[in-house]
Amino acid sequence: MSGTGGTAPGTGATGTLAPDRDAPVSLAPGTTSRPASSGGAGRLLDDGLVGLADGVASVDEARRADGSRVLSLRLHGGLHLDVLPDRGLDLGAAWWAGVPVAWRSPHLVDPGPGYGWEERFLGGLLATCGPDNIGAPRGASGQHGTHHLTRATDVRWWRERDGDEVAVHVRGDVGHSTLYGTRLVVSREIVAGTGTPAVEVRDVVRNDGHAAVGVPLLYHVNVGAPLLRPGARLLVDAPPPAVRDAPPPGRSPLVLPDPAPGAEAVVAEHRPRTPVARLTGTGHG
């Protein structure tokens, strides 16, 4: 998904501050916001079968060997997801029902400033491009911009009861500024709940500068094996895609090819008529 827009100076909404991260799930005795099902995480808590909220929705904080922070969410129902505060609150490794779904790069660590996008790109379920640039380097802006390589501040997380399920919210701010120019803040909230494979990313871009500025954003979603396998086909209601470079003979930008040494990337732009796309022929239906 991608989009380009603008924001006027001094405008933008801010999210509601979260309660204390260690606060229990709030629910009056015997009440739910929607009918409960027998297998939901909330029902397990209500019946006393699980004594603590982190028994159905846990969040573990850790640091990797390079010092970067990771919030690992494990949710009743099968979703396991890493949130990366030091990479713009993007999404790292992800599993559903024990099956890895995110593509991850073979790089062991980010080598740091001075290297290009491809050397620093670690993959993960989501890498956000922008808000200063998307695509090839342009002017002083490097390939795909700075969001994915910028640390989030004021990061916090909390749990909320949602009917018979429990949702984990992670929130933080990612700043993009120059000394005498642009001052943008991307306020991001990630929501993932028990009982569903969905994860929601809510972004609000605020312009704290003194002039209107364009804000290109591209959400670089990376799905990989074993969920995605050679032969998988993208189904999208769209005109024929525009490709950056002509693909090799017999290769379609809509079909994942077999692995081949030295194969070049095929970059295609799809302009769907509806905001829905499907993958068929994957390793798991």
Region annotations inferred by a language model:
Residues 7-14:
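Compositionally biased, low-complexity flexible segments
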Residues 15-200, 212-214, 223-229, 236-260, ...:
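Surface-exposed acidic/polar loop and edge beta-strand patches at domain peripheries
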Residues 202-204:
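Residues within well-ordered beta-strands of beta-sheet-rich folds
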Residues 208-210:
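Short, acidic/polar linear motifs in exposed loop/turn regions
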